[in-house]
Each structure stands twice: as C-alpha cells, then as structure tokens.
Amino acid sequence: MKRFIIGLLFLSCVFTQGVKIFISADLEGVVGAVTGEQLGPGGFEYQRFREFMTGEVNAAIEAARSAGASEILVADSHGNGQNLLIEKLPKDVKVIRSWPRPLGMMEGIDGSFDGVIFTGYHSSTDNKEGVRAHTFSSSRLTSVKVNGKTMTEGSWNAAIAGEFGVPVIMVAGDDAAVK
C-alpha cells in the first residue's frame, strides 16, 4: 500500500494540463488478494475484492486528474472483464469491458495517450515470490519468454504500450510485481 501511495504522489507531479491516460486494471495484485475465492464471481469474497479493485482504480484516476489528465480510459482486464463497479467510477471515464479484445488487457491503447497506469498487477508464474503469480492463464501457459527473458503480464502490456510510443508511468500491484 505504501508503494501505491508513493506512486500516486509521484504521478501527481509528472504531468501538466490536457493529458490522456490509459489504465489497465487487474485484480490479483490488489491489496489483500491471496486466494482464488477473492477473484472470481463464484468466490465468497469476490464482491469485496471488486470494491478494492474499483477503489484502486479510482485512486489512480484521482492522481491522474490531480496531475492534469483530462481524458481517462480504463480497461477492466481481469477474468471476464466485468469486475469494476462502473457505477462507482467517475461518469466521464470511459471503460472497456468483456472480451474478445484484439489487444487483450491493453484494448483501446493508441498513440494519442500520454501515459499508462497498471493497477492490481501481479508477478509471473516464474516468480515464486508472487502470491497470485501467473502469466495470462496458468491453465494454458506456464511461461512467456521473449529473447530468453521472462515476460509478466505487465512487461507484455508495457511492450504493447511501447509499440504505440506510450510510456508506463505507474505500476501498482503485489510486492513481487512492483520490484
């Protein structure tokens, strides 16, 4: 949580007026996420963790606005893509939900954005320090590597943003993901 707050404070110092921000929101890396019961519609704590996810996204939105963001797009990128409590998001924020998406967790990104924020991110399957570590779908993938380097969902999505010339300006997630 401390790193998340520090990241938000840093973000508030980065931009001037009129910037456009893309937020990719995942759930496994939100504060307190430790079991599958918290992460899917059938889980007894799922509704509570939807609240946490939405709260972290709203904190990122608030920080981006404090730093001058005038347009924000949020991609609900966990599981079925229908996790954020959209009624609790600011009305002028655009949200991408559900699937299919040609760019996956980065659907909607293009070169018009000034920065990308990742919330709720987690480490890869290869990182044993991660609590909910996986890479995209652990039932289908155990590891993704590019030129011999292990890719996390975050590094993969950062590469997609980079393809459009958009920098990742903040990552919030579990300890293993943000190291």
Model-found features: residue ranges?
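Conserved mixed alpha/beta catalytic, RNA-binding, or beta-rich assembly cores of soluble enzyme
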Residues: 123-137, 145-149
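Active-site glycine-rich loop that binds ribose-phosphate moieties when present
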Residues: 138-164, 170-173
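Sec-dependent N-terminal signal peptides
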Residues: 3-13
